[in-house]
């Protein structure tokens, strides 16, 4: 599936309402992301270029990348040329020019294609390493962050900011897969070091699953946006980040990966549609053969998950999605919402002017929509099937009272209600 995506006028900034990321022309960025974590260390330059070309054609505009990889590569932390990231292993103050020059070349590939890179300087790794095939091995740089201390981490951050500050397509991400714990001082110093030499680039932070940077760094001046991370009740976590203070934009950085932990396409679609309709800015998917670039990963680039994300991106970019306000108060969908703490919850939102409403229904069932919250005397209903892209008319209805809808599709469905033509708002 080939998708046309509007180029983003970089650099990005936080919108005045603090809910979205916008480019220099004021267009909101809808994140349709992928997680090729080991792109720098476990692919050739030619393969990296080919991969990014494919993702761009599929509508992906964001990738997650580890700048340094601790475990998940053929010869981590070395790249395929055998270059170590540091001349003294584990010492963040000794960057190896050969390694970082190649990292620049890979980031140049993304920049040339208009792809935003969420760059991780020191992925911490899960505290109880148990990934199949890598059990008991440190997945990330937690111990090294602690050992380098604030001074070494600050120097590393300053180096990264000087080296990559000109890359307007970078968003920095601090930590990942683990809460700060004893690494807090080093991580904060690293973040401050990056900001001191690259002050115009945005920054987020990733915690353990089910935790938020809003809990651990509530008042950090360097924290521009939040990365929601959940394998469980995703809408609950998204609502938490929506309600956190101070207000910051957020996106779903990780959830179920394709071809991992018995995930299904329905799980992947649910995560994506919830990520917008629960107030966020989009979703980053992952795929097991691709994220660490296992042998044969090329055969999985045109996967079903990628096609689902392409349809997700195309659907929302055709609408003024950034005007949507999530229906946490249940004034739009009054019945059929699903279990409050379950995986079958609707994702529902309406525009602030009442001319657009969207409801994602994770399974086939009836829902009741209170049409009185919509503007205008009538609304047009359209059904969209996320798994195929098929559309079906839902009729024209008089706005005013409750209306019961049941999707014509066997699995998940999106109900689109419009009282006026929608303009493109994509990025």
Task: Indicate residue ranges for each PLM-predicted region.
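Active-site mouth of glycoside hydrolases
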Residues: 15-225, 229-236
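Catalytic-core region of carbohydrate-active enzymes that cleave or remodel glycosidic bonds
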Residues: 220-294
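Carboxylate-rich, divalent-cation-coordinating active-site regions
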Residues: 10-14
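Proline-centered flexible-loop/turn and helix-kink motifs
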Residues: 165, 199, 246, 317-320
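C-terminal edge beta-strand
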Residues: 1-5
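Aromatic- and carboxylate-lined catalytic core of secreted/periplasmic carbohydrate-active enzymes
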Residues: 260, 268-395, 406-426
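Short beta-strand segments
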Residues: 173-175, 204-206, 227, 251-254, ...
């Amino acid at each position: 599936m080939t998708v046309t995506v509007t180029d983003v006028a970089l650099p990005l900034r936080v919108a005045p309402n603090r809910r979205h990321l916008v480019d220099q022309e004021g267009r909101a960025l809808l994140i349709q992301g992928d997680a090729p974590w080991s792109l720098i260390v476990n692919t050739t330059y030619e393969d990296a270029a080919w991969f990014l070309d494919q993702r761009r054609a599929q509508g992906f505009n964001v990738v997650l990348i580890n700048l340094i990889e601790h475990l998940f590569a053929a010869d981590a932390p070395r790249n395929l040329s055998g270059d170590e990231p540091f001349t003294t292993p584990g010492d963040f103050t000794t960057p190896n020019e050969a390694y970082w020059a190649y990292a620049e070349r890979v980031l140049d590939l993304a920049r040339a294609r208009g792809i935003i890179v969420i760059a991780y300087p020191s992925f911490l790794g899960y505290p109880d390493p148990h990934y199949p095939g890598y059990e008991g091995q440190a997945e990330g740089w937690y111990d090294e962050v602690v050992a380098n201390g604030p001074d070494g981490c600050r120097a590393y951050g300053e180096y990264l900011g000087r080296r990559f500050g000109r890359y307007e397509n970078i968003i920095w991400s601090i930590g990942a897969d683990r809460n700060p714990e004893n690494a807090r001082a080093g991580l904060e110093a690293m973040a401050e070091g990056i900001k001191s030499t690259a002050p115009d680039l945005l920054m987020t932070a990733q915690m353990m699953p089910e935790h938020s940077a809003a809990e651990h760094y509530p008042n950090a001046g360097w924290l521009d946006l939040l990365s929601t991370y959940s394998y469980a009740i995703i809408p609950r976590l998204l609502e938490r980040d929506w309600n956190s203070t101070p207000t910051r934009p957020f996106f779903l950085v990780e959830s179920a990966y394709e071809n991992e932990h018995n995930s299904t396409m329905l799980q992947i679609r649910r995560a994506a549609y919830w990520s917008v309709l629960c107030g966020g800015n989009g979703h980053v998917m992952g795929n097991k053969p691709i994220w660490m670039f296992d042998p044969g990963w090329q055969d999985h680039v045109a996967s079903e998950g990628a096609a689902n994300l392409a349809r997700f991106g195309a659907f929302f970019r055709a609408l003024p999605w950034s005007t949507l306000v999530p229906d946490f108060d249940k004034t739009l969908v009054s019945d059929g919402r699903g279990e409050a703490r379950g995986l079958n919850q609707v994702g529902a939102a309406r525009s602030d002017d009442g001319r657009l409403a969207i409801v994602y229904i994770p399974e086939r069932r009836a829902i009741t929509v209170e049409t009185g919250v919509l503007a205008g005397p009538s609304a047009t209903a359209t059904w969209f099937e996320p798994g195929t892209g098929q559309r079906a008319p839902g009729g024209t209805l008089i706005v005013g009272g409750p209306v019961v809808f049941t999707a014509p599709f066997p699995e998940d469905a999106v109900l689109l209600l419009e009282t006026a033509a929608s303009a493109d708002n994509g990025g």
